[in-house]
Amino acid sequence: MKKQIFAVSMAVLLATGVAFAAIQQGQVMYKQADGTYVVNTTSLTPNVKGFKGATPLEVYIKNNKVVKVEALPNRESPKLFDRVKQVLLPKFNGMKVAKAAKAQAVDGATGATYSSRAVKENVAAAVAYYKKNK
């Protein structure tokens, strides 16, 4: 009996998690419980491309500051895009939204020019979307 209750409980929990993820996945922006806005650029900037294709991001914003920028799966060269993740993405952490809107002014990662340019365009688009829709 306990095993059945546990199995049903786990199934309900899993179904709830999958449903919640599916709802958020289709949205460009959603608000987390702690007040952080998350802007997903997958559908926002489908034509912004790095060297090998789109470079979607999730940009986390709280109190008009970028908390962090996370790269989503893409087709860029892992070795070069790792450089972007290590060098460029952390530069946005703690940056005010007004400054992040001018992301093209941020220095990119050496050797990953196209990827850097695409990431900066994605950040600027995410911040603009946040400012318009928060």
Model-derived segments and their meaning:
Residues A11-L13:
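Repetitive helical segments and hydrophobic/amphipathic motifs
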